[in-house]
Curated annotation (Swiss-Prot):
Induction field: Expression is increased significantly in arbuscule-enriched cortical cells and extraradical mycelia of maize roots under drought stress.
Motif extent (NPA 2): 186-188
Record-linked Pfam families: MIP
Annotated family: Belongs to the MIP/aquaporin (TC 1.A.8) family.
Species per Swiss-Prot/TrEMBL record: Rhizophagus irregularis (Arbuscular mycorrhizal fungus)
Gene Ontology annotations for the cellular component aspect, listed alphabetically: plasma membrane
GO molecular function terms listed in the Swiss-Prot or TrEMBL record: water channel activity
Entry protein name: Aquaporin-1
Chain ranges for the short sequence motif NPA 1 as given in the UniProt record: 73-75
Record topology, Cytoplasmic segments: 1-10, 68-93, 155-159, 226-276
Catalytic reaction(s) noted: H2O(in) = H2O(out)
Protein activity control: Polyethylene glycol (PEG) stimulates whereas glycerol inhibits the aquaporin activity.
Length: 276
């Protein structure tokens, strides 16, 4: 049973996911609208639209991560449930997923209400792209984004750079998949604009199945790493050895041995070399 503190934290997390997802869509679509309206006929939108969504994700993850984790994506929520059921049980996942879909719907509605002559932000398959191609494009692009979350945020590596890395992974994935599928990588990002615009397009289901398969693929990668007991590349993986006393120290940035400096505080006398 959940105690009062856990319930409060889960409700706060769900609120953070609702607001964060709404602002992620609002800022991403709003920025894209600005570029589309002011750079029509130029190649700029092809670069700027992925940038808007990537930067919006970066900013909102940075803001909301301390509250909810800054997930904003039902597919990635499923991956978190699959990789960390202790900290992310199914009932927390369902609460987050509902909040994310509602937040995306609210953010899409705000854009439609506030932005004058806002174009349709629905994700649609491009002409000439088959359903299978679109499905696999969404799947593999989402797996990249999910791995960024699992490694940078879920494993607590890159604590301060995690929001930037996650935003950049969306940016590069959107550059790759955008011309073909609209680069959803997020069922909530697809459903909100689709409902507001009442436009679902061809094979709309791939925007739910593809990202979910991609997130599960990334979860599979994560489990393989755990089974093989392979740690993420990090400073602690590098064994450094003080040339004076021979003591190993994992801090690659350390230029001298602290214990040796107690006797002689001149750091230039010591050198630590990396050992394989």
């Amino acid at each position: 049973m959940l105690d009062a503190e856990q319930k409060k934290n889960y409700v706060a997390g769900a609120f953070g996911e609702f607001v964060g997802t709404a602002y992620f869509l609002f800022m991403g679509v709003g920025g894209a609208v600005n570029f589309l309206n002011n750079a029509a006929g130029s190649p700029l939108p092809g670069f700027a639209i992925p940038f808007c969504f990537g930067f919006s994700l970066f900013v909102n993850v940075f803001i909301w991560a301390p509250i909810s984790g800054g997930v904003f994506n039902p597919s990635i929520t499923i991956a978190l449930m699959a990789t960390n059921p202790k900290d992310f049980p199914w009932y927390r996942g369902i609460l987050y997923i509902v909040s994310q879909f509602l937040g995306a719907l609210f953010g899409s509605w705000l854009i439609d209400l506030i932005q004058p002559e806002a174009p349709n932000a629905a994700t649609l398959l491009a002409d000439g792209v088959s359903v299978a191609q679109g499905l696999f494009m969404e799947m593999f692009a989402t797996s990249v984004l999910t791995m960024a979350v699992l490694i940078l945020a879920g494993e607590r590596y890159g604590k301060y750079l995690a929001p930037f890395g996650i935003g950049m992974s969306l940016f590069i994935s959107a550059l790759c998949a955008g011309p073909y599928t609209g680069a959803s990588l997020n069922p909530a990002r697809t459903l909100g604009p689709a409902i507001v615009a009442n436009q679902y397009g061809r094979a709309h289901w791939i925007y739910y199945v593809g990202p979910t398969l991609g997130s599960l693929l990334a979860a599979g990668y994560w489990h393989i790493l755990r089974i093989l007991n392979i740690d993420v590349v990090d400073l602690k993986n590098v064994l450094n050895k003080c040339k004076k006393c021979g003591k190993e120290d994992p801090r690659i940035s350390l230029k001298h041995c602290e214990e040796c400096l107690k006797d002689d505080p001149k750091p230039e006398k010591y050198d630590i070399e990396s050992q394989n």
